[in-house]
Every structure is written in C-alpha cells, then in structure tokens.
C-alpha cells in the first residue's frame, strides 16, 4: 500500500470521520482519498477557527477528530486552538505535514520547527522517521491522545507521501482506565462517612468520564451540595435538589457560601485550577481547614494548586463507584436534615436574587456603571439579556460561550440536565472561541439545537468563518453577539485601575454584524428588548431545522461586570514621569 493509504486506513480503524483545516499541497495525497474513505474535510476560513471547531466537535460528542494544515504558516495558525484543547482535556489528532526532509535546515519555503512549536501543548508528539512506520506512528499518536485526553501530534515530512510500503496495519491497544489505589479509596470513604458538612465539587473529569450518575449516588447518599467547576455547568444536573451551581468567576453565590462551610470536599475529576476558585461576590470561599479529596486522571495535577488530604489518581467514574461502595451505612447522617435545609435555603435565596438582578455594581469611588445606565436608558443590561436568552433556549440545547465580560456575566445562568452541553474557552482563555466551537458542536450533533455566544470584540476575531458556514454543506446554527461596542473586560480594568484612560478599548458602533451576515447569505437579526431577544432565540432554534443560520445582535448598554483578574491588578505608580516631548524622531533604518 502507499503511505497515504496506510495513513487513511489507520484513521478508518479509529473511526475518525472529520478533518478540519485549510487545504495545502503538503497533505493533498491524503486529502485526495478522504472522500473514498468516508472522511469529511471541512475547509475553514482560518486554521485557528478550524482547531476550535474540532474542539467543539469532540467535546460535544466525545469522539476524536483531526486538525491539519499546510506546513509552516498554516501550522502556526493552530497554536492557539491546540493549547486551548490541551487545557480543555480534549483528545485531538494534530497532523502537521513538515517541509521535506531533504531541505530541512536550509531555511526553505514554509519551514519551521513544528515539533518544538507544540512540545508544551500536546500530551504526546512523534515524527515519522521512515515511510514504513507511517501507520505504526499514527496509531500510537491516536492512542496517546485518547489515554491523555489531550491533543497529540504526528509530524510527517511531506516527501514521505506517495511511497509504496510493505506493511501490516498495527493493532489498536486500548488500556483500561485506573480506579485509584485501595488505601486512598478507603481513606476518602472514611473522611466522607464521618463528615459533618461534605461537599462535592464536580469537574470536567465527571463529564469526560461519564461519571454523573456516580456523582449523583454519592451526593444523595451524603446529602451533600454539589458545586460545578468553573465553566463546567454541565457536570451535574441543574434541576437536582443538591445542585447549587458553578464556582468561579461570576458563578453561583450559593455554591460559594455552601462550600465555605465544608469540613470535607470531594473534588471529583478536577485539577482545581487556581482561577476557578478565586474569591467571588466578596467571599473568599475556599475552605482552608477542610479535608480535601482530589480525584484526577493525571497524577501530576494532584496537589498542584491546593493542599490535599487524600489524592487519588484515577478515572472519576471508577473512583466514585469505589468510594460509594466503601461508605459506611450511616454516612451522611450527621446533621443531615440541618444540612438539607441549609442547602435549600441558600440555593433558593440565590436563585431569587439572580432572577431579579438587573445591573452591575460600581466599586467605591467609581461611577462607570451608573453613568452607563443613565446614558443608554432604553438599552438592556447584560443580565437582562441573559434572562431573556434563558427564557428562549430549548431544554436540550448545546451552548458555547466566548471569553469576555458579557459572556462571563452569564456564568451563573445556564443549567443542564445532561453532559457535553456547555462549551467554554477554558483556562487558556482565547477570544474568538464561541463561534467556531458551536459550529463543531452542530457538525457533531446535527439534530440538536445549538447557540453560540460572543461579545462584539471576541466575535471579530473569528467572524471570517461566516464565509464558511454560509455554504450549503455546513449545518445551521444560532450565534448571539453582544453589542456594547467595547472590549469590556479591559475597559473594566481601565475604570478601576487606570482612571478611565481608555486605550484600545473602543469598537466601531457603525459596524453591523447582522448586515455582514445578510451579505454572506445568512440571516442577521438585531434585537433591543428582552421580548425581542427571547423571540429571536426561539425562532432561530426553529429555523435551524430548516437549515437557516441566524446571527443575533443583542444591543446592550455599557455596564461592566466584575473584572477577570482583580487578584492580578493594582493601581499603577508614576515615578519618572512620561511626556510626549521626550519622543525622538526615528530615521528610516536604511539611511
């Protein structure tokens, strides 16, 4: 067989049906046989978007996909999405065609050190050293991505294609996930059995490992509140009486108040990243004297950010099952009714407040939000918009959220009954995630309604994909764009620490993304009231069934929520002083 046939046959062995990228000569020998192999090549407008589409596809389906691009400048466009997928624990196949071996090191056309480029962004990488090893290496890279729940890279010199090799296809070797050590399981079960106020923190590992039912059994046995990890609102059913919402930035105040009372925390399937447990609503809620049981598939992340009493390296589902089996018969009985009452009261109070919360507060000594309300009295606030959106969303919807102020304000609102319903940029935090990732989700789940969210700044980064999704073979989506004509997160920083000296924070109010959508052959809608917003959301989700993609511009006032990095910002101090008069004229360098 040829090397490209060997490559594609391994893809078929693993059921990889979708590839995302921009066509390039360095991999045309394999893309040429994609149609015959049952592999769909989604030709995107930009490689960065292609990688984020792949992230959305895999996270919404649990199935691997592949990203590929031309060597050199095409491959460099994949840096942001691959690092995003790494911190989202998304297993992706990264295929990097390389400049030809015979010219490497000569500074040839489109040459770059592609292995070095991704070495800190993938769980495994390998270069094909000989054409006869094409299938072997690809099979191993795919297996490593699955085991590591992260992207893995195969680097292929382009002169290794179109060669005939006499090989057999390698076998697939799937390893069973580990369930942790017996001693650690016993310790965890004993701590939870004797706890007065146990709390479960449900993370990404619960979604990835399919452990929601096991988390429910534990929670119900213990009558413990269940907090969802930051950006993992789909890691526990929102309608469950013990679900108290997400921790982290703009999350659930109820979750923060309840976890602060914990004497034992079961952090299930989470690396406890530091940003997701920062103080919120003025509450420094992480329970510093509690016993912490951390469960993570990756042993290197246990105890990395928090003091841990018991660390368990293992699959969230298997670990939760074993802990449940080891609980004492009276586990959870201590103060059970008192705890149940407190959960109900705290949760009810927060939901009541959230349902009537219309506006953002100003820090003492600042007036930006007050002035924003007065300046645009007829416009919705971000919170009013989010409530209107919630009222229009179908129950089984998949949503993706970009990074940014208006999207972040929405963290406390969406709840889900099933996993793989909530896509977010994760801790790498790239702007421009919301639009491409929801395209990937719809490709993977064509019969499910989907809605993407982005601010007008973040949307501008990925808006070129409008030219892709307008084509007839692309599925229909709904994309919501919050229009407040500013880079909100950075503007919030400016109002708090830089005396409203706005540099680079303003966006063009004359630009209409709805009109851009119309020009692309898509449907553009502009809404200005809560009623219009709810109606547009409902209509657009119905229109998806008819193959109609809708971009909804939601016109907002310029209120700004809590800053992302209050922990990292401070008022600057001027020492030497800066004056325009000190700027020297620069002569052209060739003079």
Q: Can you say where each PLM-predicted feature lies in the sequence?
A:
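Thiamine diphosphate
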Residues: 95, 103-105, 109-110, 305, ...
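Active-site nucleophile and cofactor-binding loops and adjacent substrate-binding regions
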Residues: 22-24, 42-52, 67-74, 129-130, ...
């Amino acid at each position: 067989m040829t090397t490209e046939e060997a490559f594609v046959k391994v893809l078929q062995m693993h059921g990889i049906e979708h590839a995302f990228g921009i066509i390039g000569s360095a991999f045309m020998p394999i893309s040429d046989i994609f149609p015959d192999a049952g592999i769909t090549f989604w030709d995107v407008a930009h490689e960065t978007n292609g990688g984020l589409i792949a992230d959305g596809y895999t996270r919404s389906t649990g199935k691997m996909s592949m990203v590929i691009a031309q060597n050199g400048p095409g491959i460099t466009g994949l840096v942001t999405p691959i690092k995003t997928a790494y911190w989202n624990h998304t297993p992706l196949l990264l295929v990097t065609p390389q400049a030809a071996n015979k010219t490497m090191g000569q500074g040839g056309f489109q040459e770059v050190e592609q292995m070095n480029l991704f070495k800190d962004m993938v769980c495994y990488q390998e270069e094909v050293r000989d054409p006869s090893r094409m299938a072997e290496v690809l099979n191993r890279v795919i297996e490593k991505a699955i085991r590591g729940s992260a992207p893995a890279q195969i680097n292929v010199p382009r002169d290794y294609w179109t060669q005939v090799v006499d090989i057999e296809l390698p076998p697939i070797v799937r390893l069973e996930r580990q369930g942790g050590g017996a001693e650690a399981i016993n310790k965890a079960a004993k701590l939870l059995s004797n706890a007065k106020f146990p709390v479960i923190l449900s993370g990404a590992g619960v979604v990835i490992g399919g452990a929601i039912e096991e988390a429910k059994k534990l929670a119900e046995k213990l009558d413990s509140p269940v907090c969802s990890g930051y950006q993992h609102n789909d890691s526990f059913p929102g309608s469950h009486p013990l679900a108290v919402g997400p921790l982290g930035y703009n999350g659930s105040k109820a979750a923060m108040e309840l976890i602060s009372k914990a004497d034992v925390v079961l952090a299930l399937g989470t690396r406890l990243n530091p940003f997701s447990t920062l103080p919120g609503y003025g509450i420094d809620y992480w329970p510093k004297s509690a016993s912490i049981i951390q469960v993570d598939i990756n042993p290197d992340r246990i105890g990395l950010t928090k003091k841990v009493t018991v660390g368990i390296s293992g699959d969230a589902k298997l670990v939760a099952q074993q802990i449940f089996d080891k609980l004492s018969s009276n586990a959870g009985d201590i103060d059970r009714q008192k705890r149940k009452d407190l959960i109900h009261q705290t949760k009810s109070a927060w939901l009541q407040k959230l349902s009537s919360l219309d506006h953002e507060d100003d820090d003492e000594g600042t007036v930006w939000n007050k002035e924003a309300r007065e300046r645009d009295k007829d416009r919705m606030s971000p919170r009013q918009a989010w409530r209107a959106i919630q009222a229009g969303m179908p129950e089984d919807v998949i949503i993706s959220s970009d990074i940014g102020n208006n999207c972040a304000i929405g963290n406390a609102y969406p709840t889900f009954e099933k996993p793989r319903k909530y896509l977010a940029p994760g801790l790498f935090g790239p702007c421009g995630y919301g639009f491409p990732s929801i395209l990937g989700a719809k490709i993977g789940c064509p019969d499910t309604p989907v809605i993407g969210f982005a601010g007008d700044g973040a949307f501008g980064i990925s808006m070129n994909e409008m030219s892709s999704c307008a084509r007839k073979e692309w599925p229909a989506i709904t994309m919501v764009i919050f229009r407040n004509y500013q880079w909100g997160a950075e503007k919030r920083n400016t109002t708090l620490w830089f005396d409203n000296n706005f540099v680079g924070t303003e966006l063009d109010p004359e630009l209409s993304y709805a009109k851009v959508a119309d020009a692309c052959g898509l449907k553009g809608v502009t809404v200005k009231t809560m009623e219009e917003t709810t109606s547009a959301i409902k209509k657009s989700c119905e229109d998806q069934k008819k193959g109609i993609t809708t971009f909804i511009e939601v016109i907002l006032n310029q209120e700004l929520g809590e800053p992302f990095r209050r922990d990292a910002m401070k008022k600057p101090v001027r020492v030497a002083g800066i004056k325009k008069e000190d700027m020297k004229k620069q002569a052209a360098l060739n003079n």
